[in-house]
Each structure stands twice: as structure tokens, then as C-alpha cells.
Design a protein with these regions (language model features):
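Active-site helix of classical SDR
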Residues: 1
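NAD(P)-dependent short-chain dehydrogenase/reductase
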Residues: 7-54, 60-61, 67
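Residues that recognize and position ribonucleotide moieties
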Residues: 17, 46, 55, 87, ...
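Substrate-binding strand-loop-helix patch
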Residues: 27-28, 52-63, 83-101, 150
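A general structural signal marking secondary-structure boundaries and capping sites
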Residues: 40-44, 70-74, 102, 137, ...
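Amphipathic alpha-helical segments that line or abut small-molecule/effector binding pockets
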Residues: 60-71, 145, 149
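Mid/C-terminal beta-alpha module of Rossmann-like enzyme folds, strongest
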Residues: 72-119, 159
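Conserved C-terminal active-site "lid" loop/helix of NAD(P)H-dependent oxidoreductases
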Residues: 90-92, 96, 112-151, 155, ...
């Protein structure tokens, strides 16, 4: 598990920086943003869960904070830190804005998690507290909708 990996690293006693993140997306690979762009372009209606809340993380912003830590020579600040973009949304909110920014007209409807049975138990609230990271490294974290706009613009340019 991720926790076991973190504990193993901590047990070595070496200097380390572990960054926990959530709801990660980018222009590359498979992720929620690209899936929603495709589904909202090909469906008239779509159900998305509204009872799971968190904060999306743009991979470009995660890379920027890692670069900031390295470039400002702060690698001695050992510990576990949380990083995601600023703000909070549900998967439903996230999907609606992805659809809108992508120029799609799909009718996205809210639903409960129980409507999509999964062997993996997902938390209903998974917002990460970034205060330690921001205070320790002096990094200004972008708001999730601003980063989403940037990602969708880059996806549009790549077409």
C-alpha cells in the first residue's frame, strides 16, 4: 500500500520528502478529464457522483511544486506533505465544468456513489490539507478551475 511505502521510507531514517496527492489529471494518459471530455462529446446525458468531494490536482502544478522545492534547495525539509489545487468540488461539479470548458452540451446529472458499485471503497470527503506544504516551501497553489482551463486549452491545441 501507499502507507506501507511511506512507513518504509520513514523507517530508513534518510532525508525524504513525500508528497501525497489526489484526483490527478493532465493532458497525457488516462484520467478523469480526458474521459469526461470523450463521454460528454459522445453522450446526450451522463450520471456522475456528487457525494464524493475532493480537489483535483493538475499534474503540471504538482511538477511545478516539486521543481520549486528542488530549485530553491529545500530538500532538507524532511516529511510528508499534501498537494492538490486550491478549492473543493464533487466529481459531478468537476465533470460539469470539464463539459462546459470543452464546448460539449451533455446533460450531466448528479447521482449517489451507490449507483456505481465498486470493489474499492472511496471516501466521501478527500480534501487534502496543504497548509504544511504552503508554509514550509512558500508555494502559491493555483485554484483548480484555473488549472483545469489551462489543461483543457493545451488539450485543444494538441488536436
Amino acid at each position: 500500500t501507499k502507507l506501507a511505502g511511506e512507513k518504509s521510507i520513514e523507517a530508513t531514517g534518510c532525508k525524504h520528502i513525500i508528497i501525497r496527492t489526489a484526483w490527478l489529471y493532465s493532458q497525457w494518459g488516462k484520467n478523469f478529464v480526458k474521459t469526461m471530455q470523450s463521454l460528454t462529446a459522445s453522450h446526450d446525458t451522463l450520471k456522475v457522483v456528487f457525494d464524493q468531494v475532493g480537489t483535483p490536482t493538475y499534474a503540471g502544478d504538482l511538477a511545478a511544486v516539486i521543481s520549486h522545492i528542488i530549485e530553491t534547495n529545500q530538500l532538507d525539509k524532511t516529511g510528508i506533505y499534501h498537494f492538490s489545487n486550491e478549492g473543493v468540488c464533487s466529481w459531478f461539479d468537476f465533470a460539469k465544468i470539464i463539459c462546459e470548458l470543452s464546448g460539449n452540451t451533455c446533460d450531466i446529472q448528479p447521482c449517489y456513489s451507490e449507483e456505481f458499485p465498486s470493489p474499492v471503497k472511496r471516501p466521501h470527503f478527500s480534501v487534502l490539507d496543504k497548509s504544511k506544504l504552503k508554509q514550509t516551501f512558500g508555494f502559491k497553489v493555483p485554484y483548480w478551475t484555473d488549472s483545469l482551463k489551462k489543461c483543457i486549452a493545451e488539450l485543444a491545441e494538441a488536436k
